[in-house]
């Protein structure tokens, strides 16, 4: 018999395995661990519960969490509360799709491959680029991979990054760069945008590329046309990290001449989930096609002339070239990419534009309300769905108070930047109502 209900190994199985490897007992397997630190007591566990009782207890624990179903969320900074069409979960739950792994066998994976191909097509169209890959882990790693590509392509070992790029993405880039012996220089932010004069001074012959966020971490829309001219005059690459939803209204980076556009498609069909897993995207111009990291799905025809989909240009990848690959990314976020594809397809072009417009309109309404109530709102009105409000109290204290009123407050900018202590980054998406926005502004009156 098995010793444990959920472990199929019997005592005889255990004995046979120990005999094969030449030890007498399970304890002998752990002889390298000093005796004094081995756990030998009984586990102090509560008595077993029935499944209904266990579900009740877990539900009670889960109810302690603040969620965006019952709370009005104004928290963004890279992860947002957006409308997710009901059909998304139905499609991604199908057994044919329910994997995050790469479909290596095209003959049995046409549905999955076509779904990825559609994701690539929609991302390329949104960003205004020639092609996109099948997805990355998230926006931060996609940005870092873009910088590695720029360095490899230009044979230069220095990357410039705007101080208005999300600090976490910037930190991911610095981590990647350390292993590749690439220098990263941060161009300071000025009034919520990249300091253009500082960028001009920093550009030199050893700069592989410049990274900018559009809209940036503070919600501001960067002047890509001006930045593109400066960067390309230096024969460097322009790398843009973008919120794909904003591109329903804003001019795509590709139309400004961006070389690489990356970001996170969490805004389409993927819940916040405490920060992940999400889905990065990576789009480039044709000249960089053979240096793209990750999978690429291409459309072809079989011997009968029927349309089919396959993984293409695989010679770039680590399972083929090992240490000479363009990147060490192996799998991708296929399931989350599918969720984004279904969400975008469900919205359609008109729906996506409407969703973006609601973000723009509602966030500008909120900013207007803050100003009417006498709050100091920073920077220009050129933003998409996030802006910065200065308060008189610590943001952590304010947010704890807001929770009591059923509101999830904005992001504490002082966490990363001392000069922005008591400054809140407010995100307003299409999910927020006029009543919720008004209540949020009213709740902050005491912290004005």
UniProtKB/Swiss-Prot annotation:
Gene3D superfamilies: Aspartate Aminotransferase, domain 1 (3.90.1150.10), Type I PLP-dependent aspartate aminotransferase-like (Major domain) (3.40.640.10). It comes from the Bacteria. GO terms for biological process: glycine decarboxylation via glycine cleavage system; nucleoside metabolic process. Keywords: Oxidoreductase. One of its GO terms (molecular function) is glycine dehydrogenase (decarboxylating) activity. It is an enzyme of class 1 (oxidoreductase). The keyword Oxidoreductase applies. Its EC number is 1.4.4.2. InterPro entries: GcvPA, GDC-P_N, GDC_P, PyrdxlP-dep_Trfase, PyrdxlP-dep_Trfase_major, PyrdxlP-dep_Trfase_small. CDD domains: GDC-P (cd00613). It catalyses: N(6)-[(R)-lipoyl]-L-lysyl-[glycine-cleavage complex H protein] + glycine + H(+) = N(6)-[(R)-S(8)-aminomethyldihydrolipoyl]-L-lysyl-[glycine-cleavage complex H protein] + CO2. Belongs to the GcvP family. N-terminal subunit subfamily. The glycine cleavage system catalyzes the degradation of glycine. The P protein binds the alpha-amino group of glycine through its pyridoxal phosphate cofactor; CO(2) is released and the remaining methylamine moiety is then transferred to the lipoamide cofactor of the H protein. The glycine cleavage system is composed of four proteins: P, T, L and H. In this organism, the P 'protein' is a heterodimer of two subunits. PANTHER family: GLYCINE CLEAVAGE SYSTEM P-PROTEIN (PTHR42806), GLYCINE DEHYDROGENASE (DECARBOXYLATING) (PTHR42806:SF1). This is Probable glycine dehydrogenase (decarboxylating) subunit 1. It comes from Listeria monocytogenes serotype 4b (strain F2365).
